[in-house]
Amino acid sequence: MSANKKCRVLVVGAGPGGYVAAIRAAQLGMDTIIVEADKTGGTCLIRGCIPSKAIIHAAERFENLRKHSAEDGHMGISITGDTNIDMAAIVDWKDSIVNRLNKGVESLLKAAGAELIKGWATFTSSKQCIVETEEGSVTIDADNIIIATGSSHIDLPFMPCDEEFIISSTGALDLQKLPKKVAVIGGGYIGLELGCALSRLGAEVTIIEGMDSVLAIMDKEIRRPVEIWLKKHKVVVHTQAMAKGAVV
């Protein structure tokens, strides 16, 4: 089933750049269509800031529980019995937060009067594109087009992600089972966020960083508390080290 649509503004990509532009264009009275192949909200909402903070929050809760489960307890509070991790349940909880916020973005688009079409857009000219959706193709002619497609992670050529043993940051947010050991390539804020969360949950974590320190582009005053935390939690850090490959 195919359809044809015309609009004054077409936005391709419903991340924070795209959906805000679509909402504003619609608020100003322009016929607006926004196209997105994934969920609305972009990296921050779907596979970045928000889901990672959810995992981190769960990890902090678990770490605090383990303090109270220690032999002498913590602050005079003791919890008897085992404290266990259900990684799949944590991921489900994280996904529920993402889905709720995703629906919020879709509601904002609808309230502003912007039409959301879910699918992949292919341009046939500077003013026209064809969107492949689950229901069929939609041809859109637009007076103005905003391209806000964002980006994706880059695989290391010698160590491509298979999302089973070698995983991207996106895959790390969808782990169904906590790994016993994890090597994190890159000691920037994304690698450290995920590495610290997995360490709190009980994994043995090693950080591999090519520069002379973790968070190398940040001030020493910011790095120092992180380095202290890593040492305290027995996270192994190799600086000025380059990963060359992996054996699975």
Tell where the protein language model's regions lie, with residue ranges.
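N-terminal Rossmann-like FAD-binding beta1-loop-alpha1 element of flavoenzymes
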Residues: R8-I34, G191-S199
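Beta1/beta-strand and adjacent pyrophosphate-binding region of the FAD-binding site
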Residues: A3-G15, L178-G188
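Rossmann-like NAD(P)H-binding beta-loop-alpha module
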Residues: Q176-M218
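Glycine-rich flavin
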Residues: S2-C7, I23-M30, V35-L178, M211-L215, ...
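Conserved hydrophobic packing residues within short motifs/helices of P-loop NTPase cores
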Residues: L10-V12, I33, I147, A183, ...
